[in-house]
């Protein structure tokens, strides 16, 4: 991800998995990076020496958001803010609605107002999700695949995605979207199943835990490595591409695969003996088996995933030992 063009990048969701990697990558090329975080957020120590300007505020306050545009006059905005847990969206659909849909509506309005006031286009990159497509697709998912959302999270992200397309085609705003398939890293929060598995494997290998309780381990997903996907975002933004791009590996792996690899990396070969199935953890309307077709971004920008599924899990298990020293 190279620039050095004097761009000004405004990132919403800057302390999340994707936002943190994006802020780091952008800060290395000499551009200005403004990272918007919650008032209650604590900035990790490792960011202290990086060229990132952290701004606290409530992104659901449209006045605050527009004031950022007036103050910093960004060339790029990245919306990575998301209430991204599918299961939690059932428990708190209002939060999902406000963050995943209404904030996007407000952000588009702010960008449009800024353009009318200053005659300056701001490139907006919206992070969309493969959850929009539902569980019944038999073929590789392309950018044109029909949406069939099956959860509050998926429904709100689908509506937000369509808002972006409408604003681009009707109002001429410079908006790109990345349709992200599942992607993990050591920075995934612990409430996500990938971290639950890598943390569990590490703790079991150290004799601290006796079992790992999971839902349906036969679920299959198209999993990639988060920094690879963030690199795709940078390529799209650098070229100001007002278009939609699937970012995926095109390969399916199961939760059982993830468990086997994680336990092997941790030095535990009989992993099946430590797994406990809890049917209460089975997700309704599970989006299993979706594969993404990333040929569009590969052909246009030369992007392809670098880190393999096995390498990703290895990185995550090794990171558990550093984060949770015993």
Regions inferred by a protein language model and the residue ranges of each:
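Catalytic helix-loop patch of NAD(P)-dependent Rossmann-fold dehydrogenases
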Residues: 91-109, 118-123, 131-177, 185-188
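N-terminal Rossmann NAD(P)H-binding glycine-rich loop of SDR-like oxidoreductase domains
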Residues: 9-28
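NAD(P)H-binding glycine-rich loop region in Rossmannoid oxidoreductase-like domains
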Residues: 59-99
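N-terminal Rossmann-fold cofactor-binding loop
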Residues: 36-41, 59
